[in-house]
């Protein structure tokens, strides 16, 4: 059985397991030269596909190691990779402090800062702004669907082969 494991959060990475043995594992930051790379590990996955001559024909499962996908800002914008210390401090005061204290907060704060300061960054998961207002369960379902579509397209693999697992138990 051939399984490609993918972690698309902070320190994103991909690994290859053949018949239960890990043959290769690589973090995206090794290929992009950006510490704490976040998001889908495009270059790491491409490396595995090319190096081991993998395709839809011989891959059994693509194991995505994050189940909970409701925080749009978290999945859409690789802020851990590109934000400066000052960006993070501003975000704590302008976004997280009011949000966590139950006050009004700017839902599009991270999007606005990210798109203004980092317009060259590629965003793989195309999540509509309207999803911010969806109930959690519906948002989870829709973001998971967007993830499956994006992963299927970038890897040229059947959607039915893409599965989600709790990253704490992988």
Task: State what each model feature region is.
Residues 1-170:
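Short acidic/glycine-rich loops and adjacent helix/strand connectors
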